[in-house]
Amino acid sequence: SNKKVWDFVNSIVEFNRYTNCPVANYKGKLYNLPFNMNTFYQMWGVLTPEEAKAKIEEQKKEALAALNGREPQNLEEQALCLVGKDIFEKLIKEYTEKQWGRKCTELPAFIIKRLPVRWVFDNNYFNDKYQGIPIGGYNQLIDGLLEGIECKTGVDFFHSEYKDWKKYADKLVYTGAIDEYFGYSLGKLDWRTVSFKTRIENTPNYQGNAVVNYTSHEVPYTRVIEHKHFEMFGQDVYNCTKTVVSEEYSTEYKEGMEPYYPVNDERNNLLAEQYRQLAEKESDVIFGGRLAQYKYYDMAPVIEQVLSLFV
């Protein structure tokens, strides 16, 4: 955790105490995430770290033996070598295939360099010292960042007067898709996107958690979000008699959709690097964020990067 980042965002809006502790639902059975002693107890009934380690090591050996001395060639082989068959098949395989729209045997091994495993009973998804969500939601943070700054929405940068931006500024901060900036001159990058189906449930507490991942193909969506758990805790959950839930669906990006995630396969990584080389020649343009750098970023590292550039 970066205290400078935490202090900066809290200077704009106060953050609450939310910590992400997702639950996985595999065919009606629940497992805590990330992989920790609670998960291993739910999976095998083991009570001690040594029992859990023995179970995973046994399954890892089977996976390594199947490779017969060669390196893992795809995500499935890599994951099996890291956590074994049970965790892979119930919590990784089908969820990953829904996320990426590809079989695990078709995804490159390097997507999963490592899978964090905790030998303690700890469901806190992140290890960061500072965690939370802006009180009132992220709109409060964005409004605070833009305070006193002229902001125009609904403007297509590439089909407006601002395309000739040097009339207005010495430098441009560009956060759109890097391939679009260069007119797709080297080809189009692939993206994944998500869509949501949101509804109101006539119950104060629908699933008891902010995030529940659905890790089997039997359910078409990847997860269900119950929004009130981001901001309401304890008895406050029941003070509001209804709740808003969203089903999240992962799909292939098509023109007109909003791109969310870069596709980290060999073709796209090579193409993205070629675009980054073009970007380096644009001395008056700062390419920042997921779309402009074609990299998956969490929020804190992006803010840290911005502070290093401008503060």
Task: List the predicted regions and their residue ranges.
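N-terminal FAD cofactor-binding segment of flavoenzymes
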Residues: 1-31
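Mid-domain catalytic core of redox enzymes
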Residues: 158-278
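Active-site/ligand-binding neighborhood in enzyme catalytic cores
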Residues: 20, 24-34, 38-171, 182
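Conserved beta-strand segments of alpha/beta enzyme cores
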Residues: 14, 150-152, 284
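Short, glycine/charged-enriched secondary-structure capping and boundary segments
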Residues: 12, 186-189, 301-303
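C-terminal catalytic lobe of FAD-dependent flavoproteins
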Residues: 258-311
